[in-house]
């Protein structure tokens, strides 16, 4: 991970970390990064602290995209297959890491989390599943738990259109990147 400062200087802030699947700024400074585990990385000295180890989730092969809510909880998708290893997709999960460091599984049946974002009021979580070709929406409770998901947008079959990143604008509109450039 590289940092471009306001003066235009580039520096490497997360050296020698393979497989970064997602990252978010942490409220106390530094970054939260996903990949082989979920870790906090200091932007000052590069110190790393594991927040969620891969072996904490049975059958998980890694973590992909993640985001944080207003309270500082971390929402992340786990993988249950090697995405670039030629394996057939197997469902992973959507998890939340609470403020006390505990992890809860919120939703099952996720093939490839590739975008997470909250509505401006924090009451809805949007979740793109690249291999399923859809964006899910969840209602979010005050404790960070979510209700059952509903289909927010279907982009295709995960082959012809691949939702590969998601951002929610200040006006509440949801922007989804398509890895195949179909729209």
Annotate each PLM feature.
Residues 138-145:
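Short loop/turn segments immediately following beta-strands, especially the blade-tip
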Residues 7-9, 46, 101-102, 133, ...:
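Short coil/turn linkers that define WD40 beta-propeller blade boundaries
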Residues 40-53, 62-66:
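A generic, well-ordered mixed alpha/beta core segment in the N-terminal half of proteins
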Residues 5, 42-44, 98, 139:
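Structural recognition of the beta-propeller blade-terminating site
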Residues 8-15, 49-56, 102-108, 148-156:
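A short beta-strand motif characteristic of beta-propeller blades
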Residues 16-35, 56-74, 80-81, 91-93, ...:
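Beta-rich, blade/repeat-based domains predominating
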Residues 1-2, 37-39, 85, 92-95, ...:
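A short loop-to-beta-strand structural motif that recurs across blades of beta-propeller domains
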